[in-house]
Amino acid sequence: VLHKMPKYTRTVCMEFFGTVATATPSIVEIRDFLLAHDSVRLAGLEHLDWRYVRAVGYATKAAGKGRPKMVLLADVVSDDEAAVEAAAEHICELARARDGEGFIAVSPEARKTFWLDRSRTAAIAKHTNAFKINEDVVIPLERLGEYSDGIERINIELSIQNKLTLCAALEQYLSGKLPIDKMGTDLPTAELLGERGKHALAHVSAVKARWDWLLAHLDTPLADYKARYGATVHAAPKAKDDESCFTAFRDFRLRVSVKEDVMKPLAEIFSGKTDTKIIEGLGKIHAKTVRGRVFVALHMHAGDGNVHTNIPVNSDDAQMLQTAYRSVERIMKLAR
């Protein structure tokens, strides 16, 4: 059956800056509002999670807000121009009620500009060799928040595991014979290196132990993590002591940083001219490990509950593929 498109179309772009748990119910609210509308219909609704927003290089429309946590694009149509305009404005109000902003495009050119970011979703795999494991998970829209939470749990665990893999590789490197540049001298390597290798190894091992504990205690109150590890914990001032470490991670109030916790301190330890080859070796290990990181990204077509769940991978990295397949098993259990 071919349907004639209504005469008037408005494209609404909604940017959400609060938590994903706060933002996702807006999808159901928009759907229900337009399903009940007498003369306006929802012709298209697309959802991008924050990983897609970052990957496509999304240019935020709201001034001074930073990168949104979620973006929705909606086409609303009607033969009644006043009705479609009012509906688009109401959708913007729904977004603002959930820590978001709404923007309306009227002309075909402006509408096309709004949709450009959606056409670049293949960029999610730009850090790999453009290979992805794709899953179409169909869930009730009312459960999207719960599903997103589950995916975020998987992503947080994958992120910490990748950092632990890096720590293990660095420990192995630092435990071996380090490449000291003797700068044309006859001094023994041990004398030139001093205690720097031991200090570096002890530092990496301490960070690894902290992240091991964190991975095993994601449901523990943040206060316990802070009490145990003090100033080494990267928690935002607005983080709540009684929330779980997972919740703080999910809502961007807690982070673990390879740059701040590992690579920067190692660069300070190995800061001498004799250490350039050591730093080069550390950098290669870091780059190789980061290349193998696995994450799950979500976007959704049409607001119909068909959630495209994508895992970018390098097809030549067997370990990365195995990690991705284990994640798929968890995703399938979550969906069921």
PLM-predicted stretches and their roles:
Residues V1-R336:
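Noncatalytic alpha-helical scaffold of FAD-dependent oxidoreductases
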